[in-house]
Structure formats: structure tokens, C-alpha cells
A protein has these predicted regions:
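C-terminal, low-complexity/hydrophilic appendages and adjacent surface loops
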Residues: 144, 220, 342-343, 420-501, ...
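Short, structured active-site-proximal loop/turn typified by the sulfatase FGly-forming signature C/S-X-P-X-R
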Residues: 56-92, 98-99, 103, 131-137, ...
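Bacterial N-terminal signal peptides that target proteins for export
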Residues: 2-11
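C-terminal motif of bacterial Sec signal peptides marking the signal peptidase cleavage site
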Residues: 20-21
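Catalytic-site neighborhoods of secreted/periplasmic enzymes
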Residues: 94-202, 207-228
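Substrate-binding rim/cap in mid-to-C-terminal beta-strand-loop elements of soluble/periplasmic
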Residues: 96, 103, 160-165, 301-304, ...
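Active-site-proximal N-terminal segment of extracellular/periplasmic enzymes that hydrolyze or transfer
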Residues: 28-79, 85-86, 482, 497-505
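Active-site-proximal cap/lid insertion segments
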Residues: 39-41, 55-56, 61-62, 194-198, ...
Length: 551
């Protein structure tokens, strides 16, 4: 049911019926939970994703994110969880395979003609959990191939929504439908599976807050061919007294700031219109962003209500996260892309388990690479041999030890790896002309690809050209082929501690972080030579290098 139909239906319902369907976010559903594994001795897994939602330590004052608050009370909140790649296609390929983009070869969004579908030979979470005896179903946004009717070749059944990328107002229009389809599936297929003694994995992929991508209130201007102010809906009327990031007007020409940030900003504004030019504009932008989250939260609350009403919180583990973040004006940027700033790659993660106490917090590092092993750990239910057999090619870690004991160190010592290889975002002066062959051309000498590492204390990244993959062994080699960035965690991330190269008091720290990054790449990727670009891009990156053409 889309938003317009919902509004028409509400008019016909009596107020008492509407109130009866509301959840009181102040009650404690944990009091009603009795852990009850299914007849196969396992729990269902209900995996909820949002799109473009950055981590928030505290929700904005005045919001009513009842679904998220409910999950926080019920589950374990992972406070330092990071995406491994941006944007949607890349990150989702990691989530649904447990492999970095160097293996999935999903380097850019599939709606570009130069991007291939993900290989159907690559095992997905759906395939892995089927091997563990689960029925696997998928609802909502996919965006890892151009399929429009079925995901059976990717290990998932019962996908009915078709491929959605997150177009103008698509979250506003379709998130209610996604929730409805998930509930309908649970009432019919899910219930029958459990009655027959089989556990299931259900992925519910919402679209919002992705609608923020196209927000624009400037009269007479258009994005993606449409004027895109906020919808005329009560959910979108609220304003929040939340300060904009102090770095909203940070210069892109600031000494030490990677040039990739300026290129990205030029590219992004060409795609979706100019960014706000003052703090008030960013405040309006963020108000809309918080309201898109509220809109999605309302639909997620309906889903959680059904889980509680149907008793599915007794026999299901619920996991909620987002594919990547949204900059929201931090460092003068909007959107998501190739940088290691907090709003870009720090995302929410909550895991509810019927057997575990709720309201707990894990403050240790975790990563999207860890989700697939977590799913398999749940699905194999203590069968160590089966778990090892299914995950032998994965490099992430199960998060279940941290669900049982939030103090458990998952990857503090080794760090979390971030990879970025989108040719569509590296050149602000790109050429897109359908009459040209190829139609898309960018400067492949610009340093816009990223390898980054997040540790408990620092973030470190090197930005390099698509035609200059490298694994620098020393300080001089590091600077020869890369723009280098070192940020201290817990700060506003406006000081690049790696800059300047010469006579830098932090040189030893930079060298240490480079060594840690190299070690993590070796562990989770192996040889990092860019060979994936020949598979992920039709013809390889050189095909789209405008330096090879007369301009």
C-alpha cells in the first residue's frame, strides 16, 4: 500500500481503530518475551536495513523514533559499527556476501551502463543460509543487479517489489508497501514455515532516509527532472533544534584536505543541485533528513508491532542497520561517497536476541563485513563444523560473542577496512554524453579511490588514482602515489594529522597506520592490484579515461 492509499484509508477508519493500532513506546515488550526456538532448534532471522542513515548517538530532540527506541530497549546497540564501502550497490554487496568489493566487483551503482551485475556464482547470504537449512526471502531494495522479477539466482525467494534505486520521494511512496509485503509474508509463508519446523531469514530493505538525496527547496530549480521539496505531509512539517555541524563551511581548498573531497562536491552538486550556502539552509536540509527517518520509523514500528503481536519476538532474532550514512553538511558535504568522515561511514546496528538482556551497548569496533558470519553463526546454532565449512572463504567475524558479552573485542586490534572505487564520483569535470562511445568519461589520474582503516583511536586513509593501485611499503612511497589523511577519533575531524608530509611530528604514527592498513588489506583482500576493476567495469577503468580521448 503506497502513501497516497494509506492516507485515503486513514480517512475511512474511526479514531478508535487508529489508536488501537498504535504502539506505546514507553511499555516494555521484553516482559512478554519467552525465548522459544523453532522445531529445528534455531531462531528466525529478520534483517532490517535502511538506506543512507548515519549513526546517531542520541536521536534529535522532538523526534519520535519509537521503533528505534524499542529496538534499543530490546537489543544490543553497537555504537562503533562501520560500512566497508559506499554507496548503495557497493555496500549492499558486502552486506549480502560477507566479502569486500574487491571480491564482489560491485564498485559503482548498477544503474550505470558501465557497471556489471554481481556474479551469480558468488555465494550470498541467501545461499549460505540455505546451506544451513533456512528458507530465505527478500523484500524491498536490492540494487546489486538489474534483476526486476526474481532473486532466486542470488539465493533469495519471494521478492515482489522489483528493483528500486531510491528515486525522488521513493521512500515516502514505497516504504509502507515494503512493510506491508513483509507482514503479509510473515502471516502466510513465514508462519507456515515455522509450523512445518523450518526457520527462515527475511530481509526487509527500506528506502528512506534516501529521499534526502533529492531534497531541494529552491523555487524554480529541478533535480532529476523534478522539483523536490518536502512532501505535503504532517510527518514532514517538523523542525528540530539541532545544531548543524560546525564544519559546514570548511574550505575544500584547506591545506592538507584531500583533493577528492572537492571533486566529489562538484560532482554531487551537478547531480542533485547546489548545497546550502548558510547554516539556515543546512538546518532545513537536516530537518528534512530527520523527518525522512521519522517516516521510515513509522513503517518499521508497524512491522515491530506485528512481530510482537504474532509472538515472533519469541522465536526470531532481529538485526537492524543501514547500508551507509549521509554527510548532512559535515565538512560542507551532502550525500555519501569516498571519504572516511563519521557521517559517511558510521552507521547504526542493533541486534535483538530473545535469550539476551536488552538495553546493552557494545563500544568496540565492528564492520559490515561481520554481518554475513553473524547470520551463519545464528543459522548453524553451535555446529562449529558447519559454520566453518560455510564461512571458510569469509574474513569477517561473527558478532554473536558481542551479543552475549558486549565487552568482547571483535576487531579493535586489527581495525575496520573501508574501500571505495566509484569512477562516477572521482572527477567533478566528468563528461556524460550519450552520443559518445563510451558515453561516460572521467580523469582516471585524479586520486579518488580510497583505502582506509578505522581503529579505536584513529582513522587513516590514502586516496589514489584508478590507474595507480599501490601498496606503499614506506613513507616516501606512501606520499608518492597517494593523498594521505589521518584523523583522530572523537574530534570534529577537521585536522589532517598527516599533513604536511615533511617535518611532521606525526610521521611515525602515519607510518604505523599505513602498516596497519597494509596488514588489514593483506588479511581481508590479499593482493590489492585493482584486478576487480576489469570485472566490475565493462572494459575496465581505462575504457572511461578521458585522457585517452581528444577533448
Amino acid at each position: 500500500m503506497n502513501k497516497q492509499n494509506i492516507q485515503k484509508t486513514l480517512v475511512l477508519l474511526p479514531t478508535s481503530a487508529l489508536l488501537a493500532g498504535c504502539l506505546d513506546a514507553t511499555d516494555n515488550p521484553a516482559n512478554k518475551i519467552t525465548p522459544t526456538p523453532n522445531a529445528d532448534g534455531k531462531y528466525n532471522i529478520i534483517f532490517i536495513t535502511t538506506d543512507q542513515e548515519a549513526y546517531m548517538e542520541q536521536y534529535p530532540a522532538g523526534s519520535n523514533y519509537a521503533a528505534r527506541e524499542r529496538l534499543r530497549k530490546l537489543g544490543t546497540t553497537f555504537e562503533k559499527h562501520y560500512a566497508c564501502a559506499n554507496v548503495s550497490t557497493s555496500s549492499r554487496s558486502v552486506i549480502y556476501t560477507g566479502r569486500h568489493i574487491t571480491e564482489t566487483c560491485m564498485l559503482d551503482n548498477t544503474n550505470y551502463a558501465f557497471v556489471n551485475d554481481m556474479s551469480r556464482d558468488l555465494p550470498t547470504v541467501g545461499d549460505m543460509l540455505r546451506d544451513a537449512g533456512y528458507y530465505t526471502a527478500f523484500k524491498g531494495k536490492w540494487h546489486i543487479s538489474e534483476d526486476t522479477e526474481s532473486l532466486e539466482e542470488y539465493g533469495f525467494s519471494d521478492w515482489t517489489e522489483g528493483n528500486m534505486y531510491g528515486s525522488v520521494w521513493e521512500g515516502y511512496k514505497e516504504d509502507g508497501t515494503i512493510a506491508d509485503h513483509a507482514i503479509d509474508w510473515l502471516k502466510s509463508k513465514g508462519k507456515q514455515l515455522n509450523n512445518d519446523g523450518q526457520s527462515f531469514f527475511l530481509a526487509v530493505n527500506f528506502l528512506n532516509p534516501h529521499d534526502i538525496m533529492y531534497f531541494n527547496e529552491t523555487p524554480g530549480t529541478y533535480i532529476a527532472g523534478e522539483a523536490t521539496p518536502a512532501p505535503d505531509d504532517p510527518v514532514y512539517k517538523k523542525s528540530y533544534n539541532v545544531p548543524v555541524p560546525a564544519s559546514w563551511n570548511e574550505s575544500f581548498d584547506k591545506p592538507g584536505r584531500p583533493a577528492a573531497h572537492k571533486e566529489y562536491n562538484k560532482q554531487w552538486q551537478d547531480w542533485v543541485g547546489p548545497s546550502p550556502t548558510d547554516s539556515l539552509g543546512w538546518q532545513t536540509f537536516r530537518d528534512y533528513y530527520f523527518n525522512t527517518i521519522q517516516d521510515e520509523d513509522n513503517h518499521m514500528l508497524v512491522l515491530l508491532k506485528y512481530l510482537e503481536k504474532a509472538g515472533l519476538l519469541n522465536n526470531s532474532i532481529v538485526i537492524y542497520t543501514s547500508d551507509h550514512g549521509e554527510m548532512q553538511g559535515e565538512h560542507g558535504l551532502k550525500g555519501k561517497g569516498g571519504n572516511i568522515y563519521e557521517n559517511n561511514i558510521h552507521v547504526p546496528l542493533i541486534i535483538y536476541h530473545p535469550e539476551m538482556k536488552g538495553g546493552r551497548h557494545c563500544y568496540n569496533l565492528t564492520s559490515h563485513l561481520d554481518l554475513a558470519p553473524t547470520f551463519v553463526d545464528i543459522a548453524t546454532a553451535g555446529n562449529v563444523q558447519q559454520f566453518s565449512a560455510i564461512t571458510q572463504e569469509l574474513h569477517g567475524h561473527s558478532l554473536m560473542p558481542a551479543v552475549k558479552n558486549p565487552a568482547t573485542d571483535i576487531r579493535n586490534s586489527e581495525g575496520a577496512l573501508f574501500c571505495f572505487e566509484m569512477i562516477s564520483m572521482i572527477d567533478g569535470d566528468y563528461v556524460m554524453n550519450p552520443s559518445l562511445k563510451p558515453a561516460y568519461r572521467a580523469d582516471m589520474n585524479k586520486r579518488g579511490f580510497v583505502r582506509g582503516i578505522i581503529t579505536p583511536d584513529y582513522k587513516f586513509a590514502r586516496y589514489f588514482a584508478p590507474v595507480k593501485f599501490n601498496t606503499p611499503a614506506d613513507y616516501e612511497a606512501l606520499w608518492a602515489d597517494n593523498d594521505v589523511e589521518l584523523l583522530m577519533c572523537g574530534t570534529d575531524e577537521t585536522e589532517n594529522l598527516a599533513w604536511p608530509k615533511d617535518n611532521n611530528a606525526n610521521q611515525q604514527l602515519v607510518e604505523l597506520m599505513n602498516q596497519k592498513l597494509n596488514a588489514l588489506i593483506q588479511r581481508e583482500i590479499g593482493t590489492d592490484d585493482g584486478s576487480e576493476t576489469k570485472k566490475g567495469y565493462k572494459g575496465g577503468v581505462e575504457m572511461y579515461d578521458k585522457n585517452k580521448y581528444d577533448q
